[in-house]
UniProtKB/Swiss-Prot annotation:
Function description: Modifies, by uridylylation and deuridylylation, the PII regulatory proteins (GlnB and homologs), in response to the nitrogen status of the cell that GlnD senses through the glutamine level. Under low glutamine levels, catalyzes the conversion of the PII proteins and UTP to PII-UMP and PPi, while under higher glutamine levels, GlnD hydrolyzes PII-UMP to PII and UMP (deuridylylation). Thus, controls uridylylation state and activity of the PII proteins, and plays an important role in the regulation of nitrogen assimilation and metabolism.
Keywords, sorted A to Z: Hydrolase, Magnesium, Multifunctional enzyme, Nucleotidyltransferase, Repeat, Transferase
Protein name: Bifunctional uridylyltransferase/uridylyl-removing enzyme
Requisite cofactors: Mg(2+)
GO MF, any single term: [protein-PII] uridylyltransferase activity
Amino acid sequence: MVLPTTKDATAAGAGFDTVRIIGDIDALAEKHAGHEDVFRSAVSRLLKAELAKVRDAAQAKLLRDRHGRHCAEWLCFVQDEIIRLSFSAATRHLYHSPIPSDGERMAVVATGGYGRGLMAPESDIDLLFILPYKQTAWGEQVAEAILYCLWDMGLNVGHATRSVNESIRQARRDMTVRTGILEARFLTGDRALYDELISRFDTEVVQGTAAEFVAAKLAEREERHHRAGQSRYLVEPNVKDGKGGLRDLHTLFWIAKYVYRVRESHELLRRNVFDVREYRTFRRCADFLWSVRCNLHFATGRAEERLSFDLQREIAVRLGYTSHPGMQDVERFMKHYFLTAKDVGDLTAILCAKLEDQQAKPAPVLSRAMSKPPGAEVRRVPDSDDFIIDNNRINLAAPDLFKRDPVNLIRLFRLAQKNNLAFHPDALRMVRRSRRLINAQLREDPESNRLFIEILTSNDAETVLRRMNETGVLGEFIRAFGKIVSMMQFNMYHHYTVDEHLIRCIGILQDIERGDNDEVALAGELMRTINPEHRPVIYIATLLHDVAKGRPEDHSIAGARVARRLCPRLGFNAADTELVAWLIEQHLTMSKVAQSRDLSDRKTIENFAAVVQSVERMKLLTILTTADIRGVGPGVWNGWKAQLLRTLYYETEPVLTGGFSEVNRAQRMAAAEAEFRAAFTEWSGHELNAYIARHYPAYWLKVDLEHKIRHARFLRASEQSGRKLNINVGFDEARGVTELTILAADHPWLLSIIAGACASAGANIVDAQIYTTTDGQALDTIAISREYERDEDEGRRAARIAEIIEQVLEGRLRLPDVMPSRAAGKRLRPFVVEPKVTINNQWSDRHTMIEVSGLDRPGLLFQLTTAISKLNLNIASAHVATFGERARDVFYVTDLLGARITAPTRQAAIKRALVHLLASGNTAE
């Protein structure tokens, strides 16, 4: 990295008057002569106060000019001065040696991140005390004096004291030490010791070991990405260690320094590692990431490196982002962040390409594992004279082939896919430089569009589309897609940026088509039976279903408009274009109906059938819905949701076919019972028959096999123990929840009591599956957010919930007496969800449906059920779901006489009461 010159740093650090502070330290030495401990404490207090003033000034300047790298340089300069002052105080006033011996020499050196000359406000300080020989009493005293001064100031200091010989020995065998010395920067003391270390390091450690170092750093990078999250598009990224973060830039520069022996980042231009545009990108990325990191540290007062939801909005405001129609300020900031992370990935690929170029020359740069194998030859790609195969990677046969025929910008990716070839870094670099050739003419070209559909519908489309996206080709070719590249949705439900989500959905769709995943068995079965002509339809609908995110209007409706404009260009006829548009417009419908409607109510099925209108469209919508839910992130798809979709599909099929179904309800009941009998062999046939009769058909059709078996064991254990109320605890690591299965005598207020008990124990309900047995027992499975790391602690919390439920049911406890006053948790505070209450009688002939949506918070379900009961309504069934920070609960209700709520004035009163309840918990910071 470029270091500040003395002149620049001094100017930047105006307000830190080194000369004055030296005078103050001298005065303290005179005042406290003979009292070393008092003098040390006084110096620490003085320097701490001066540093605090500088940090305040640095933060104010950062908020004004938003130049993160300048802020990091300023803070580093001041820290350098503080270390020099503490060294001066130690050697002039505490351990002064008028005629120092050869052993009384020391160089104080900055290493690691501090050695780069850039420092975030709460960063650690890494120091190396270099001695000529072994440790001496004088050296130990001086080093301790400096360290205690820094520690007393509240700074985090990592340190080592070594001779030059020992430093060289350790650098040879320890890559961490080697990297630290690579970044070493002289601070104060004996310059000759530092120069000796660097000279010997270059000749005795670095020389001839470039391949080893590069391999180690790239392996370290992969391990770091694995720990921080492999995707650079995770929506709560680690600014320092995440993919596309500052550490990746540092790794680039470490490799460049080691291989090319450069000291300053601008030397990368002279060595032709980067061209001018790429170097500017390097500097721009560094400045932006340093701005984010410095603001994170200032905002939290700690070395916080993760851009969590509760910090993203504050950092966006600090950096001056404003909201635009369809996009919040925080979403615009995070889009900039992810675009920067993408640029960092591009720079990494460019450096790797340069290193591979070097490998072809005599100077050894890379290890054999990264170089061309002996005998590797360059040959033409089959069916093309424009591309070559270089070490099993596709490359350009001529540098001007994109200019000669811009269709080659699409053809490159199709040929790589067709021939199972990796991409040569040089080819990707040329693609990035040629993106401007993708114009209206190329977008309308029939051949380029044919090639794109082949890419989309052929093997390994996810990998190829991701390469197209990373190089910018996908966003230029489909401009609507370009608008959602690196777009983050500011919510806790989606795990990835919009473009990454869509590309992952294509990969999931191909998993579904291969049929090798039992978790999506229904979608796999349907994929094999759709009209073959509709295969491209489901692929393009999957790629485009969220393409209109970030617009002011409903993204489903806007996305359908995009499809109607785009699909004819891609070769779809009018009927298929309209089918794609319909799938995009309805892509949320099936999930919503399955998870928040009563699937045992005939009206629900009829309404859904009226939307889909044909079995073929329902098949396609089921496949798209499955891919969409699975693509949201780990743990979002589960057995409950799979079973609900299956139930909705097979309940609707007979309505669409006039009574005919490939699998009718009776057959599905028989199949579900047979599946349970085959899997659960612990009971006799008589016991199984009796148990199966305890559940209504809806239970057997909607509950997945794993939970059916768990419930059977639980009910048997409860009977044997004689307990009227029992709770079984399970842990779902994939979803990050604890499942409470509650068996109790059915009670009109039972759901409210369960919700209140969970709230009183600090448990937040995120999902609920509620059933009643034929003998009047309630069997409710409640998923609560996991609070504790250890299962034992979660188990104790569950026991507390069971105790509260039992005491309330027996009349020994009133819930209001144990309900805490809880605001939204820290994770929810940044979010605002507009309260929404919908009341209608169209989804049921027997009940009125009340759908509420708002910001989730502890105790919300208890508050809602209590409010509904106080409104003189009976809850017939409830469908509880949480999507990140958003709660969406549906209640099927009647009045106390069992009638639906039809009076507009009564509906309005219910709506007002529930909206007020939801609004009382809305928050944002």
